[in-house]
Amino acid sequence: MKGIGTDIIEIERIELAVSRSGQQFLDRVFTAAEQEHCQGKVHSLAGRFAAKEAVLKALGTGLREMRWTNIEILPNHLGKPEVTLSGPALERAEKEGIHRILVSIAHDRGRAVAFAVAVGKEKEG
């Protein structure tokens, strides 16, 4: 394990950001594929936002030179969220020897919570 991160957010905060800034907020934080997957469902957007924050913490950095869209979180064929990094986020992961990042997302009582674990390559032998 190379790092861990967690985040919790009130779903209402994301709802407010969407109502205030609309598409500008969505485009700044979420990839086109994430937006298509969430279909405007605020709880899904909030879960992904929390997951991106958790991933940043697992990487051991804040946004700094990264963009929110350098971290993409989409479900695999079984519905499990999977992280895809690009640009500076991918460079940071490679520099730290991070092979993949596992995430878990949950929603309850008006909040979304996410947990991320950065995993290094398994040792052979």
UniProtKB/Swiss-Prot annotation:
Gene3D superfamilies attached to this UniProt entry: 4'-phosphopantetheinyl transferase domain (3.90.470.20)
One of the GO BP terms on file: fatty acid biosynthetic process
Cofactor section: Mg(2+)
Binding site for Mg(2+): D7, E53
Segment forming the signal sequence: none
Enzyme class: transferase
Keyword annotations: Cytoplasm, Fatty acid biosynthesis, Fatty acid metabolism, Lipid biosynthesis, Lipid metabolism, Magnesium, Metal-binding, Transferase
Catalyzed chemical reaction(s): apo-[ACP] + CoA = holo-[ACP] + adenosine 3',5'-bisphosphate + H(+)
EC number assigned by the record: 2.7.8.7
GO cellular component: cytoplasm
Family per record: Belongs to the P-Pant transferase superfamily. AcpS family.
HAMAP family: AcpS (MF_00101)
Name of this chain's protein: Holo-[acyl-carrier-protein] synthase
